[in-house]
Amino acid sequence: KSLSYQGLWRLINPVLKSGLTKRLMGIHPERSVPGLAPPAYMKAYENGYSVESAAGHERAVILWVDEFTQANDPLLVGKACDVLGALGYIPAVVCSPSGRAAISGGFLPESKKIAQKTLKKLQNSTKTLQNAPILGLEASAVLSAIDEYGRLLPDEKVWISSQRIATLDK
C-alpha cells in the first residue's frame, strides 16, 4: 500500500525544518521554514463550502485557494470563509494552483497547462454561480491570473479582464 499525502506530511515536516535541509537549500539556520499543513483541513473546507452549495445564492463569492495557501495555511481558508459569511456572503472554495512558481521559473509550457486548468475551473465556477466575483487569498496568485494568464493564453484575455478578480484584502 502506498503512503498517501495524508500520512506523508507528518514525515516531510521534520525533514523540511531540519538544519541539514536548511543548509542544503541555502536557508539561514535561524530562519523558520513553514511546514505542510494536514490535508484534512482543506477537504473539510472544500466539502463544506462547495460551488454546488453556493449555487442559486445572490451573494455567492468564489474563494480561490492557490497551492501555497492550500499546502501551508489552510486555516486561513476557514477564517476567510468565516469573515465572508459574517458579511453576508456565501463562499464557494475552489482549490486550483496559480502556477506562480512555474511562471517565475520560466517553465512556460507547464505554466500554460496550469493556467488553462485553473481558468477552466474558475470559468465553470462563475457559470454555476452566475458570474460571482473571484477572491484570492494570496496576492501573487491573483496577480498571476490578472497579469500573466492573459499573456500565456491570449484567447482568454477578454474573459480574464472582464472578471471581478481581487484579493480578499482589496
Where is each model-derived feature located?
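Iron-sulfur cluster-binding electron-transfer modules in prokaryotic oxidoreductases
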Residues: 1-170
